[in-house]
Curated annotation (Swiss-Prot):
GO cellular component: cytoplasm
InterPro entries attached to this UniProt entry: Carboh/pur_kinase_PfkB_CS, PfkB_dom, Ribokinase-like
EC number(s) reported in the record: 2.7.1.-
Superkingdom of source: Eukaryota
Protein name: Uncharacterized sugar kinase
GO molecular function: ATP binding; ketohexokinase activity
Keywords: ATP-binding, Carbohydrate metabolism, Kinase, Nucleotide-binding, Transferase
Source species of the chain: Dictyostelium discoideum (Social amoeba)
EC category name: transferase
A biological-process GO annotation: regulation of glycogen metabolic process
Family: Belongs to the carbohydrate kinase PfkB family.
Length: 355
């Protein structure tokens, strides 16, 4: 079995500030800045890579096209450092594009960058550049699209593919081929209605697809810090869409430190939506919440899929991963170790795992 993480790999410029401006046109000083490896796919892969046995090649990061500029080289070096292994086995680079400023039709002009501002309330706001261009490039360049779908990614019931929402156009193609080939999917935040409609037009159903996991948050669905009852309403409305086709998914709807709702189908069994309240890091210990959801995804993939543990234990493990990732700046600059996760689980009277 191969677990493939495909999605956002970028540079994160993380800037700490006291508070966000209260009005336009005002000045806010930056306390500090760090330039880090970032992106949902990077954050998830670096976490899992910390835990797998050395020499393990079943966990792969599929990197979207990069530009061979200083930022692209920075990402490549950081990924090579993080794996500690030969990159061609665990990290697959779709394309390293030479800089070409003369071609106006060339979408791939620069490596994507995110400016992240973290305030004293530990909340962050992000500004990105280069992401839609790469998405367009991956679907409009026939050679690259074919390489992603027929060479870089492996499909079939013995494989998993995990996606995030920043490249929706190429994601649709990956999701459709995954459904057709009965490939397991773990999807974060991606809009799915369009894909389901397109599959329906092609007389293809997701009914018999292997395992489907959909993770999203109150940032996308609303009701942030709101009543739990409303989260269940949101989840049930989602399950009822398109004649109930989304009931095939295991749906995880998170609300930051407050917990998450979970329900749907796992291993062909229906789970009635319920609320999961995780053990939390004290608020005064939180440094930055960037990548918490990615680390949660990493924990669930590692425990539930890679190690075949129970759903309840895997949720505890994933929650601990997400919480501990908030103790440092950036999404994957200092990922939690198995030892630190087990200490956290023990401290909160939970089952320790993978000792």
């Amino acid at each position: 079995m191969t677990i493939q993480i495909f999605g956002t790999v970028c540079i994160d410029k993380v800037r700490k500030i006291e508070e966000f401006p209260k009005s336009l046109g005002t000045y806010t000083p930056v306390i500090s800045e760090q330039i880090l490896l970032g992106g949902e796919a990077s954050n998830t892969f670096v976490c899992i890579n910390e835990w797998v046995e050395k020499g393990q090649e079943s966990i792969k990061l599929i990197v979207p096209p990069l530009v061979d500029d200083l930022n692209g080289k920075f990402i490549i070096n950081k990924l090579n450092q993080s794996t500690g292994k030969t990159s061609d086995k665990n990290v697959i680079f779709t394309q390293i594009q030479e800089i070409n400023n003369n071609n106006e039709n060339n979408y791939l002009k620069y490596t994507p960058i995110t400016d992240i501002y973290v305030c004293n309330k530990k909340e962050r706001t992000m500004f990105g550049i280069g992401f839609p261009e790469i998405d367009q490039y991956m679907v409009q360049c026939k050679e690259i699209k074919e390489k992603i779908l027929n060479v870089d990614l492996q499909f079939g019931p013995n494989h998993w593919i995990s996606l995030d929402a920043n490249y929706p156009l190429i994601n649709r193609e990956v999701i459709k081929k995954s459904i057709i080939t009965n490939t397991n999917l773990y999807i974060m935040d991606q809009e799915l209605d369009t894909v389901v409609d397109e599959l329906s037009l092609e007389n293809t159903s997701i009914e018999h697809t292997s395992n489907l996991i959909f993770q999203s948050s109150s940032d996308h669905f609303g009701n942030k810090d709101g009543p739990i009852k409303e989260f269940f309403n949101i989840m049930n409305q989602w399950f009822q869409k398109d004649n109930g086709i989304f009931k095939k998914f295991l749906f995880i709807l998170t609300d930051s430190k407050n917990g998450f709702g979970i329900g749907g189908t796992w291993n062909n069994e229906w789970i009635e939506p319920y609320w999961f309240t995780p053990s939390a890091i004290p608020s005064d210990k939180v440094v930055d919440t960037t990548g918490a959801g990615d680390s949660f995804r990493a924990g669930l993939i590692f425990s539930l899929v890679h190690k075949n543990q129970s759903l309840s234990d895997s949720l505890e493990f994933a929650s601990a991963c997400g919480a501990l990732n908030c103790l440092s700046i950036g999404g994957c600059s200092s990922t939690p170790t198995l030892n630190s996760i087990n200490q956290f689980l023990k401290l909160n009277n939970k089952n320790q795992m993978f000792l």
